[in-house]
UniProtKB/Swiss-Prot annotation:
One GO MF term: nuclease activity
Record bears the keyword tRNA-binding: no
Enzyme nomenclature, EC number: 3.1.-.-
Family matches, as CDD domains: YqgF (cd16964)
Protein name: Putative pre-16S rRNA nuclease
Taxonomic path: Bacteria, Bacillati, Bacillota, Bacilli, Lactobacillales
Function: Could be a nuclease involved in processing of the 5'-end of pre-16S rRNA.
InterPro entries documented for this protein: RNaseH-like_sf (IPR012337), YqgF (IPR005227), YqgF/RNaseH-like_dom (IPR006641), YqgF/RNaseH-like_dom_sf (IPR037027)
Gene Ontology biological process: rRNA 5'-end processing
Length: 139
């Protein structure tokens, strides 16, 4: 079963994919989007869904530290609804608190990557962490 993890922002969607057995997550890419123009990167996402034969989506939920939901949670859930409508595949949600912080820390401490390069990979790594946390919790 292939599961696709998504870190949905207002300008990009980080994409990760599980291995066929659902043990590990691998970051794939970052898809540019524009919420204000209604451009959600679905053309590219469709290519990836078909290429990897995706069975399910996991979308990160950026809850506040006190476990309340803010406007980005609603945007992520709306994106999940869009996925369900378009692909007719199940969508689960994974708490993504601090995944971007953890991803940035990994890039600084372990890879010593400059700020400019971090911006180019941070969402992909965050999607990978969201998916890996989901896989660890579920399987």
């Amino acid at each position: 079963m292939r599961i696709m993890g998504l870190d949905v922002g207002s300008k990009t969607v980080g994409v990760a994919i599980s291995d066929p057995l659902g043990f590990t997550a691998q970051g794939l890419e970052i898809i540019p989007i524009d919420e204000e123009k209604g451009e959600f990167g679905l053309e590219r996402l469709t290519e990836l869904v078909e290429q990897y034969k995706v069975d399910k989506f996991v979308v990160g939920l950026p809850k506040n530290m006190n476990n309340t939901s803010g406007p980005r949670v609603e945007a992520s859930q709306a994106y999940g609804d869009l996925l369900t409508e378009r692909y007719k595949l199940p969508v689960d949600y994974q708490d993504e608190r601090l995944t971007t912080v953890a991803a940035e820390r990994m890039l600084i401490e372990q890879a010593d990557i400059s700020r400019g390069k971090r911006k180019k990979v941070i969402d992909k790594l965050a999607a990978q962490l969201i998916l890996q946390n989901y896989l660890d919790r579920t399987f």
